[in-house]
Design a protein with these regions (language model features):
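Conserved, well-folded catalytic cores of nucleic-acid-processing
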Residues: 9-13, 128, 248-251
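N-terminal Sec/SRP start-transfer signal
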Residues: 1-35
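Short acidic/glycine-enriched loop/turn elements at secondary-structure junctions
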Residues: 89, 98-191, 216-218
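Hydrophobic, regular-secondary-structure patches
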Residues: 35-37, 41-111, 117-121, 126-140
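Hydrophobic alpha-helical segments of integral membrane proteins
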Residues: 2-6, 10, 51, 55, ...
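Charged, alpha-helix-enriched surfaces in structured cytosolic catalytic cores
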Residues: 1, 19, 42, 46, ...
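Mechanotransmission and gating elements of multispan inner-membrane complexes involved in transport
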Residues: 172-252
Length: 252
């Protein structure tokens, strides 16, 4: 009944044109608003997917960190046990801390992340270089890969046409006795090799280099690390993987 009553006004003659026009305009506005809402939601969903993609580029599937403090001990037998797990595609050992990068007069604080040669296999960072190459070098001749924001802050040059910057990496030392503040910091040089551009949170704060260089500068023990980053095989149930890893590592 109500539908028939309303339809009369949509089909009205000239004497009721005002109602007819208002009805069609209202219908058009509602339709337009609905389309806009769908468009906004679609754009938002796409943006959410982009953000997740950017974060997954930098972060591994699983990251193991100590319950307390900044480091934990991981003996060779536990490393082998992790490597032998069926769901582990690969993993990288990490030595990480806050540092200061100095390039001549320019200085900038960063989070320095020492990684091993497996890092290329578990991270998307090497595929996000805007210039240079992904080369972490060795303990004695380390390479440095920095975020785009860090590059600008410290005026770091990686262009092969010019001499790449040699950057001083200033790090805290562990296990130092005495009250001399200078004895508690270390300085080492790393050659700038590449620049990554992912997202401001990472680009403005992170620098990657050789894990053995970082451990050497910070006086880490041979089996001491800050984290383990693990890439899981496709189809792995994350909760089950974490449970098995917990059984190996215990309460480190």
């Amino acid at each position: 009944m109500y539908f028939k009553f309303a339809w009369r006004y949509f089909r009205a003659k000239k004497s009721a044109n005002a109602i007819n026009i208002i009805a069609w305009v209202t219908t058009g506005v509602i339709a337009f608003a609905t389309c806009c809402q769908v468009l906004v939601l679609s754009v938002f969903n796409g943006f959410e997917g982009l953000v997740k993609s950017l974060y997954s580029t930098f972060y591994s599937d699983v990251k193991i960190v100590p319950q307390k403090g900044k480091t934990f001990l991981l003996p060779a037998n536990k490393i082998k046990a992790i490597k032998d797990l069926a769901f582990v595609y690969n993993f990288s050992l990490i030595a990480e801390d806050k540092a200061l990068l100095q390039n001549e007069e320019a200085k900038t604080p960063v989070i320095i992340k020492g990684v091993d040669s497996n890092y290329k296999k578990i991270s998307g960072v090497p595929q996000k270089l805007s210039s240079g190459i992904f080369s972490i070098g060795t303990a004695d001749n380390p390479g440095l890969i920095v975020g785009y924001g860090v590059q600008n802050a410290a005026n770091i040059v990686v262009d092969s046409v010019f001499a790449a910057s040699t950057v001083t990496v200033i790090l805290p030392k562990k296990y130092i006795k005495g009250n001399d503040p200078l004895a508690s910091i270390s300085e080492g040089n790393a050659k700038a090799k590449g620049v990554f551009a992912i997202q401001q949170e990472f680009d403005n704060n992170y620098a990657l280099t050789n894990i053995d260089f970082v451990k050497q500068q910070m006086n880490f023990k041979a089996d001491e690390f800050s984290a383990i980053e693990i890439k899981l095989k496709t189809g792995t149930k994350e909760n089950e993987a974490k449970e098995k890893l917990q059984n190996i590592l215990g309460n480190s």
